[in-house]
Amino acid sequence: MNDFWQHCSALLERELTPQQYVTWIKPLAPVAFDAAANTLSIAAPNRFKLDWVKSQFSGRISDLARDFWNAPIEVQFVLDPKAGQRSPAGATPLAPRAPLPSANPAPVAPGPACAPAVDAHAPAPAGMNAATAAAVAAAQAAQAAQANAAALNADEAADLDLPSLTAHEAAAGRRTWRPGAANANSEAADSMYERSKLNPVLTFDNFVTGKANQLARAAAIQVADNPGISYNPLFLYGGVGLGKTHLIHAIGNQLLLDKPGARIRYIHAEQYVSDVVKAYQRKAFDDFKRYYHSLDLLLIDDIQFFSGKSRTQEEFFYAFEALVANKAQVIITSDTYPKEISGIDDRLISRFDSGLTVAIEPPELEMRVAILMRKAQSEGVSLSEDVAFFVAKHLRSNVRELEGALRKILAYSKFHGREITIELTKEALKDLLTVQNRQISVENIQKTVADFYNIKVADMYSKKRPANIARPRQIAMYLAKELTQKSLPEIGELFGGRDHTTVLHAVRKIADERGKDAQLNHELHVLEQTLKG
């Protein structure tokens, strides 16, 4: 059992980033192996780690166990029995308590429970005059009130999905950076992730970069290095599965490494709406505002869900103003350009436009290949470039689709006991490839582009050359090459029998201009999203 765990840990250390390995794998320990039942029990130091490792790494550990023992092994994750003897992470205050008088009163244990009442009329201890006794009693009463406030704040936070604040933090609002404090022990690190809602797996190290996202990544790194100074707010937009969420988690994780005392919160817009509703129902807007206005970094995902929700927009506007005024960083994502989000107040749109807005485009061929190769490597599988290119050529929309296709290929290969080849890949992705080919056709592209630029579909085949017709025709040719499997001669034939060199010229022209013309790039992005449904 121990030999296996050494082998498993060594492999995972090579596959994961140092941060991931130290945070999630190193604290684990094998505690039991039942050879008769083929079960392996692995202990985690706390519930948070247990749940995360179970959801993120159980599959890989099970695969390694099967390979090691040459038999299917059921891996069970259990809580370390010693975990209950330690104080919960949340009981450790993250900011210093208010100082007490120099007299030495009996200590009051910190914790979420309400502190015991203090009897102000109790006799003074021997050797202590009345004035000193009164000071001690006052200090104890203040500390009891402080503990009660923390408990009440924690209850309200649980209702509103607001990570609890210590009483000192609740009173002081913002706090200063305290580098190194969060790394004091494993529980403190877990507590940071619980409060921030960050996914520690999503980092800059494992973010695959290409032309489609290099500007967004550069801006994200700049913001992580200079929060509240460079590009505030940072607004990232693009279709689903293109890496927006990965990138904003990477910013949060980097800032947490650099400044462990930072108050960071990632939240999906729908959860923010839910918090506003609960605060309204419970008349708890003071707690709501105190929490959101005191952050150092707010990461809000899919803000288009604010559409039509006026009260949510109003509260977010006040939070935005408070954060920016305090030089806190705000990062927002959406599926579309800010001005095109319907149902959002104009004053919010103007705030979004006041920082830096960056699009993340669908990954180009080389980037899709790199994503597949890296993902396969992380799964411990050797994927040939031929197979990666085949998949990347046929699946073009987003990263999630690529990763889903790869999982399907790996499962198909394992189930049938066959090597991963192009033939096996075609079999594994048969349904997916059929759907892709059925969804986007050259005819559909011609109609969509014609409607977008308000010309006739017949103009796509005609010999007319006015700019208002020739330009959309070139765009349609470019999209036909990008989104279908048609060859240049086949595309030319479908555009009124044009020569393949004409199509090649159009494709190169639009591809070149796309990188220089923001308006054209935006139009192409809209057309691609429309065609992909």
From Swiss-Prot:
Residue numbers spanned by region Domain II: 72-196
Region called Domain IV, binds dsDNA, residue ranges: 414-533
GO biological process, one term: regulation of DNA replication
UniProt domain comment: Domain I is involved in oligomerization and binding regulators, domain II is flexibile and of varying length in different bacteria, domain III forms the AAA+ region, while domain IV binds dsDNA.
NCBIfam families: DnaA (TIGR00362)
Domain I, interacts with DnaA modulators: annotated segments: 1-72
Family, per entry: Belongs to the DnaA family.
Any single Gene Ontology cellular-component annotation: plasma membrane
The protein's name: Chromosomal replication initiator protein DnaA
Gene Ontology MF terms: ATP binding; ATP hydrolysis activity; DNA replication origin binding; lipid binding
Stretches for region Domain III, AAA+ region: 197-413
InterPro entries (UniProt xref): AAA+_ATPase (IPR003593), Chromosome_initiator_DnaA (IPR001957), Chromosome_initiator_DnaA-like (IPR020591), Chromosome_initiator_DnaA_CS (IPR018312), DnaA_C (IPR013159), DnaA_dom (IPR013317), DnaA_N_dom (IPR024633), DnaA_N_sf (IPR038454)
